[in-house]
């Protein structure tokens, strides 16, 4: 069942209910604090939902235009830590489903905190039934209706977190000296192309942008990848005394 925005009114009602409880039983100060905190939660939740929806729509549009290549580019451009939490349902197949499920359950746990508050504070009347029903409806909307139909892949989140390490293991920042299109300059972390001014270190053969490695070598005498000495040591100064005088050509 796909009801992507139905959780927003339930979330707003739950937060308004918590603010009203604080006002009725603890006064204006508690209501002000609860209302401000509830507003922050709701705004952040709306932003997260909008971000996920935007990423999913953009990935779907790029996949239609580029035959699937655009989705991979968006996945590489997105921060690896945010992908498991904010990626949309249509942005990455099984990984996107796992991300959607993870995000929904995280928000559900947050709002489940209000359920004990309602049970403890409310008096025995019909109001507690209404409040408890609202909280349960919010949790059901977020956990059941918004969960993906397919089973979540438990390895997708870990794979997203380890994307940077995988890139380093595959040698994407090695600069092997062949000028491959996927090589990256380990100084500025940008891609390298043959049309750019590149420089190979003589001893190890690692390749970098000429400008980047020039600035690096002014402060460090070693290769930023393998730490091999790239700059020859300075020539020894002439010894003091007679040898220094002999080195001077007489006028």
Swiss-Prot record:
Its EC number is 2.3.2.27. InterPro entries: Znf_RING, Znf_RING/FYVE/PHD. It is found in: Membrane. It is an enzyme of class 2 (transferase). Gene3D superfamilies: Zinc/RING finger domain, C3HC4 (zinc finger) (3.30.40.10). Pathway: Protein modification; protein ubiquitination. It comes from the Eukaryota. GO terms for cellular component: membrane. GO terms for molecular function: ubiquitin-protein transferase activity; zinc ion binding. A zinc finger (RING-type) spans 185-227. It is a multi-pass membrane protein. It catalyses: S-ubiquitinyl-[E2 ubiquitin-conjugating enzyme]-L-cysteine + [acceptor protein]-L-lysine = [E2 ubiquitin-conjugating enzyme]-L-cysteine + N(6)-ubiquitinyl-[acceptor protein]-L-lysine. This is E3 ubiquitin-protein ligase Os06g0535400. It comes from Oryza sativa subsp. japonica. The lineage of its organism: Eukaryota, Viridiplantae, Streptophyta, Embryophyta, Tracheophyta.
